[in-house]
Amino acid sequence: EIIVIDNASADNSVEMMRKKFPSTRVISNVDNLGFGKANNKAAKLAKGRYVCILNPDTIVFQKTFEEFIQFHEANPTIGISGPQMIDGTGQFLLESKRGLPTIKAAVFKSLGLFRLSARFFGQYYNLSLPQNQNGKTDVLAGAFMFMRKRLYDQLEGFDENFFMYGEDIDISHRRWKLGYTNFYFSQSKVIHFKGESTPKNKAYEKRFFNAMSY
């Protein structure tokens, strides 16, 4: 099943979706509820064993979901998994796998020191785990998150105190308290055009810094 939730867009995309994809369930919000609250609303309607949180500015491949289902079926202790994300030019996106953003890790990242030494300064982007190697990681990107519906319900979804940004870090960390592992599934790739659905303005900057401070 495909559930599309629209956060008060003004570009006629709701009408387009309903016309071109009549089998898709489209929910149109009158107001912009924010990333987490909107996804929680959609997830409550999902009936499958698995849920995949997927941004509108992504492209998945023919066997993407099949690969993730098979991976989770074979690994019952996996909590949340995510793919190797690349941008529209084919460049690897570092946020595909991350460590917890401690103050030290965030400082190293903001100063660009991770480019000098992955071993000493690469915690933010979990650079100890190679790009093309599957492995455990603390944080996965909200642009593509795959997990069992049961786990999503146990976690009570995203924390709706985050309007946008930071909710993926929060939910990735909370699954640890339930004894599950997050996993970077490098052999499955997804194209992410990175922010094409988000306007960059003062409100965007404020939401980002508020999320990082929460």
Per-region residue spans from a language model:
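A conserved acidic beta->alpha catalytic loop
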Residues: 6-15, 31
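Acidic donor-diphosphate engagement hotspot in glycosyltransferases and nucleotidyltransferases
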Residues: 13-14, 38-39, 63-65, 77, ...
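Glycine-rich, basic loop-to-helix element that forms the pyrophosphate-binding segment
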Residues: 28-46
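Short aromatic/hydrophobic "clamp" motif used to bind/position activated sugar donors
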Residues: 51
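Conserved donor NDP-sugar-binding/catalytic core segment of glycosyltransferases
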Residues: 59-95
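Short, flexible, basic/aromatic active-site loop/helix in glycosyltransferases
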Residues: 100-137
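Aromatic-glycine-rich donor-binding/catalytic loop that engages nucleotide-sugar donors
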Residues: 127-165, 174-180, 185-187, 193
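Active-site-adjacent helix/loop segment of glycosyltransferases
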Residues: 169, 173-214
